[in-house]
Amino acid sequence: MANAAQRTAATGSLFGLALGDALGWPTEFKDTEAIAALGPWRELPLPDPAVVTDDTQMTLAVGRALQAATGHSGGTGDAGDAGSLTPEGLERALREEFVAWYHSPENNRAPGHTCLAACRLLDGDRPWQQATGAGSKGCGANMRVAPLGLMPGLTDEERAGAAQLQAGMTHGHPTALAASDLTAHAVRLLAEGCPPGGLPAALRAYAGDNRTVYHERWLGGLWQRPALGATPEEFIASGWDECLAALDRLEAALPGFGPDSDPCAATGDGWIAEEALATALLCFLRFPDEPVTAIRRGAATRGDSDSIAAIAGALAGARLGIAAWPTAWCDRVEYRTGLLRLGTAWDTGR
């Protein structure tokens, strides 16, 4: 039987992502000295209004695409149960959402060049494999993948394939695919009650088990675009190997990581997908029972602070549920209604 936190895991994760995003946007592109001038990092205030970036916008886009592709809002016993999510249906829904985001007047939050370029090319009939940034492994691939870890009723193959597809439509590098799959799996494990201390080993095991699994049903011939392997298996293995190396750095950093140290110095600045996950994990695992502190730590970094804090918030919220976050913060974060709609639907169907 699910405990109280698990019953609101989806809502907690989505709000955590948005709150981390809103905290981290004002500090993005600032060095540690400039951030320190704002005051103690443990007291970093949530801006008012709590405006978010493309991280939250695209997370909502992925969530809405999942709903459209399954014909439901996440409940069990209907068209959204396991087996209903197909690559063709999800690709159509993601394309529609990504193109709408590209043209939206609210798409003015310093979005990444790779996402913009790919979404512009998706506006038409060309195959998505020809629109993607084939050599890009930017964190735009996995900053938005949390919904794949939260939506109930998916098979393991659907969850992994869909996580990689949503990444691959804009970021075609194998590490972007693997890191997105791994990020979604981390969110799922925590939502299901995995203890934080066991998470790194569980992620390492998952990466090892999937190292040579190329999801051809979902990815088609994507592996042939960047020359990163002679076979589909070699292509995807190169991405998982970079994720495993990032987990190595995470596990090496954890024992001696001081709370006032910049996590980016240990696990990377987070501009690329595997570093964004590793550094977010470092923030979360250093403060597993202090979710607000975890996202503040992610926001007060020299790197891609909004994405690091957003992923850390998604992890913390998946574990602790909506009670992790101050009610006053949740009430004023941008896109509150959309976050609540998705989270409630998926929590109800859990």
Q: Which residue ranges define each predicted feature?
A:
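Structured, active/binding-site neighborhoods that engage oxygen-rich ligands
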Residues: 1-350
